[in-house]
A protein has these predicted regions:
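A short, small-residue-rich loop immediately preceding and capping a beta-strand
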Residues: 68-90, 94-102, 186-194
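Short, well-ordered alpha-helices that flank and scaffold nucleotide-derived cofactor binding pockets
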Residues: 62, 89, 93, 203-204
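Positively charged, low-complexity intrinsically disordered leader regions
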Residues: 2-71
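Conserved mixed alpha/beta catalytic, RNA-binding, or beta-rich assembly cores of soluble enzyme
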Residues: 192-204
Length: 204
């Protein structure tokens, strides 16, 4: 199965992932049900990191690179989160440092942490492993690291930390994807966790 990317490479001299942020993923029909294939937003191929959260994560990093000329990103989330391979692969694409805050001494037993390690991420182990505590530690560490930004837990933009125009821009990048949803669709079933993708869809 193919993704929407014409080639798969970390090398920005070969391909810039951000050029495809607004490209539409296809709608495909199986057994009379139509699926919006967000899993085909896959810059490293169909079996690699993919999806709408990957797109939003890429947008965040691309904005930081363009507006702040950052040198690295600090991220804190639970060991099982796909946030880890997302941010580490994007940092590798942009040649940025990636520091992941974890609450597990045995983080290398977890698949997403192994993937992040392979992408070049470094790790800081803390005593508390709850998501909110890890994000707090990430912000503390970023203050000590020049040129670093924090990827918020769940790849979101908290209204307490971000101005309204940034929150709107964050959701706008996902909102474009409704453009090719067929007009005859009457009912949409949307899986949700953090609800970021849901908000983007509704905004679109």
């Amino acid at each position: 199965m193919n993704s929407i990317f014409p080639q798969y490479s970390f090398d920005r001299s070969q391909i810039r992932w951000s050029d495809y942020l607004k490209d539409l993923t296809p709608v495909e029909e199986y057994g009379g049900v139509k699926f919006k294939r967000e899993d085909k937003f896959a810059p490293l191929g169909f079996n690699g990191v993919n999806g709408s959260k990957m797109r939003q994560c890429l947008w965040l990093v691309d904005e930081w690179v363009k507006t702040k000329n950052i040198t690295g990103i600090v991220s804190g989330s639970v060991v099982g989160s796909p946030q880890h391979p997302f941010i580490s692969s994007i940092c590798k694409h942009y040649d940025l440092g990636c520091l992941i805050v974890t609450g597990s001494k045995h983080y290398m037993k977890h698949t997403n942490m192994i993937l992040a390690h392979r992408m070049g991420a470094q790790f800081k182990v803390e005593k508390i492993g709850y998501a909110r505590a890890l994000q707090s530690k990430a912000f503390q560490l970023a203050k000590k690291l020049p040129g670093h930004e924090v990827l918020e837990t769940n790849i979101t933009v908290d209204e307490r930390l971000n101005p309204p125009e940034r929150i709107e821009a964050f959701h706008k990048i996902g909102s474009y994807q409704v453009a090719n949803i067929p007009d005859d669709i009457e009912t949409m079933i949307i899986p949700c966790g953090s609800c970021n993708s849901v908000v983007s869809i509704l905004y679109g």
